[in-house]
Amino acid sequence: DYEKKGVIVQGITGSYGSLHAKQMIAYGTNVVAGVTPGKGGQKFEGTVPIYNSMQEAVNATNAKISIIFVPAKFFLGAAKDALNSGIKLLVAIPEHVPIRDTMEALDLAKQKGAVIIGPNTPGIMIPELIKIGIMPPMPFKAGKIAVLSKSGTLLYEISDALTNAGFGQSITIGIGGDPVN
């Protein structure tokens, strides 16, 4: 039932966040809210409510999944906001996150019983069902093989080769290319 799970997009009003939020919605991902401090009360694309904090967004939607599209220097604050609000799966797109910030976020996630994918991940995709990240949909086809990779490009290439050979993917996960993830 992953297609029904709500996803919150942190940084939804930024250029990168808005571009990929639109693509995630077009793919079928259930984006239930966005978070950008100072932009609460607005709507993204006329339908997705924007909140000032993750706690407000989680209270309104009961979502357990979030994706972060903020610059690396704001990652730790965004991760803490998400994890302290009850998020259980956090997809961290920013690259070059300071190692100390990543370690602190991972420690908090462990304390909260949550998982962080990334930083510097292309995200997670269940082909033909949901996309939480920046992956292009073309290389992927639904099937039975799970693909995990530290490199986003290799993830796409492996999935494309499998697809072209007639083998689909059950899930694809980019674990993140930063030194610690």
Enumerate the predicted regions with their spans.
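Catalytic-core regions of core metabolic enzymes
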Residues: 1-181
